[in-house]
Amino acid sequence: KNMITGAAQMDGAILVVSGADGPMPQTKEHILLAKQVGVPNIVVFLNKEDQVDDKELLELVELEVRETLDKYEFPGDEIPVIPGSALLALEALIENPKTQRGENPWVDKIYQLMDKVDSYIPTPQRETDKPFLLAVEDVLSITGRGTVATGRVERGTLKISDTVEFVGLKPTQSAVVTGLEMFKKTLDETLAGDNVGVLLRGVQKKDIERGMVIAKPGTITPHTKFEAQVYVLTK
């Protein structure tokens, strides 16, 4: 459930596979889910490289990963695969948080991974010119500040002091935006593609729940009948 909720918001993903063990059953499940919910691009990190003494074994694991990606209609031959050790990189950064490129081989592997993410996963065109819409993923109550709804901005822009409506599941209500936050940074404005927390005035936590949307007033109407394409996942 959580994998589906998160994956549905992604422009791309990093698939982490143990270089020592190879693809596990949940690896295939995650690739399948990524395909079905529309994650367009994947980059692979072969973890635990430090535990593999035989380079040929690591190459066999990489080949197996590429074949698995092909099976689920990702371009296995093209997808970047970066070996490394998350643990050794983390230990190096804990010992010296200011470690730069070229100063530690394991930290360099993480830089290489992120370089591939930047080059292989394109930044999609964002629909910033359309009316604001955010799908609510979670709702929090912050003492003394108000109610915060978090989620991904599907389209449009939003600024502090804007009025919004929250629609679906319950009667439509409106509220004023008093704050915007993303990755512990406060914002004056949020754009399509951002994962953001929206602080709302004049609304209780019980009034909003996951599955609702926050939208520009008058732009979204709730419906009780619709057509959908559904994937049913079996164990």
UniProtKB/Swiss-Prot annotation:
Could you list this entry's UniProt keywords, alphabetically sorted: Chloroplast, Elongation factor, GTP-binding, Hydrolase, Nucleotide-binding, Plastid, Protein biosynthesis
Q: Which GO terms describe its cellular component?
A: chloroplast; mitochondrion
From its record, what is one biological process in GO terms? mitochondrial translational elongation
List, alphabetically, the PANTHER family matched.
Answer: ELONGATION FACTOR TU, CHLOROPLASTIC (PTHR43721:SF5), ELONGATION FACTOR TU-RELATED (PTHR43721)
Its main subcellular localisation, reduced to a broad class, is plastid
The record places domain tr-type G at 1-125
Binding residues for GTP: N47, K48, E49, D50
Q: What is the primary gene name for this protein? A: tufA
Disulfide connectivity for this sequence is none
The molecule here is called: Elongation factor Tu, chloroplastic
The molecular function GO annotations come to: GTP binding; GTPase activity; translation elongation factor activity
Family assignment from sequence similarity: Belongs to the TRAFAC class translation factor GTPase superfamily. Classic translation factor GTPase family. EF-Tu/EF-1A subfamily.
- Which EC number applies? 3.6.5.3
Q: Which reaction does it catalyse?
A: GTP + H2O = GDP + phosphate + H(+)
Q: What does this protein do?
A: GTP hydrolase that promotes the GTP-dependent binding of aminoacyl-tRNA to the A-site of ribosomes during protein biosynthesis.
- Subcellular localization: Plastid, Chloroplast
